[in-house]
């Protein structure tokens, strides 16, 4: 550095000395883009409309909730498992009695 002010020309970076594991990356690697036909096949996933009737998750409420979803077969099975195990739907009235965030 010459002078009292630092300029960009005063900095010389030698990454190989600082971080020897840093190697240049070939951005033109051997990747291939999918064909248009493969892309169209992925978009043609068959979905079906399902009507779900489930009781309110609150123990004191007898309301039946109706929910309509558009899902794949595997998606609706996953949702069904959640409803049977970890997830409970609430009606608007019971939701108003609960605090958000699990409190």
From Swiss-Prot:
Keywords: Activator, DNA-binding, Early protein, G1/S host cell cycle checkpoint dysregulation by virus, Host cytoplasm, Host nucleus, Host-virus interaction, Inhibition of host innate immune response by virus, Inhibition of host interferon signaling pathway by virus, Interferon antiviral system evasion, Metal-binding, Modulation of host cell cycle by virus, Oncogene, Transcription, Transcription regulation, Viral immunoevasion, Zinc, Zinc-finger. Homodimer. Homooligomer. Interacts with host RB1; this interaction induces dissociation of RB1-E2F1 complex thereby disrupting RB1 activity. Interacts with host EP300; this interaction represses EP300 transcriptional activity. Interacts with protein E2; this interaction inhibits E7 oncogenic activity. Interacts with host TMEM173/STING; this interaction impairs the ability of TMEM173/STING to sense cytosolic DNA and promote the production of type I interferon (IFN-alpha and IFN-beta). It comes from Human papillomavirus type 8. It is found in: Host cytoplasm; Host nucleus. The lineage of its organism: Viruses, Monodnaviria, Shotokuvirae, Cossaviricota, Papovaviricetes. InterPro entries: Papilloma_E7. The keyword Kinase does not apply. GO terms for cellular component: host cell cytoplasm; host cell nucleus. Pfam families: E7. Belongs to the papillomaviridae E7 protein family. Plays a role in viral genome replication by driving entry of quiescent cells into the cell cycle. Stimulation of progression from G1 to S phase allows the virus to efficiently use the cellular DNA replicating machinery to achieve viral genome replication. E7 protein has both transforming and trans-activating activities. Induces the disassembly of the E2F1 transcription factor from RB1, with subsequent transcriptional activation of E2F1-regulated S-phase genes. Interferes with host histone deacetylation mediated by HDAC1 and HDAC2, leading to transcription activation. Gene3D superfamilies: 3.30.160.330. The E7 terminal domain is an intrinsically disordered domain, whose flexibility and conformational transitions confer target adaptability to the oncoprotein. It allows adaptation to a variety of protein targets and exposes the PEST degradation sequence that regulates its turnover in the cell. GO terms for biological process: DNA-templated transcription; symbiont-mediated perturbation of host cell cycle G1/S transition checkpoint; symbiont-mediated suppression of host innate immune response; symbiont-mediated suppression of host type I interferon-mediated signaling pathway. Highly phosphorylated. A motif (LXCXE motif) lies at residues 27-31. It comes from the Viruses. One of its GO terms (molecular function) is DNA-binding transcription factor activity. Residues 1-45 are annotated as: E7 terminal domain. A zinc finger (unnamed) spans 56-94. A motif (Nuclear export signal) lies at residues 76-84. This is Protein E7. The gene is E7.
């Amino acid at each position: 550095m010459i002078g009292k002010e630092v300029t960009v020309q005063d900095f010389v970076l030698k990454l190989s000395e600082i971080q020897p594991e840093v190697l240049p990356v070939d951005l033109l690697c051997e990747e291939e883009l999918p064909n248009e036909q493969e892309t169209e096949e992925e978009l043609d996933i068959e979905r079906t409309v399902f009507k779900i009737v489930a009781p309110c998750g609150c123990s004191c409420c007898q309301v039946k909730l109706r929910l309509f979803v558009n899902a794949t077969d595997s998606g609706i099975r996953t949702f069904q498992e959640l409803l049977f195990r970890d997830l409970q739907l609430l009606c608007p009235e019971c939701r108003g009695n609960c605090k958000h965030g699990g409190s």
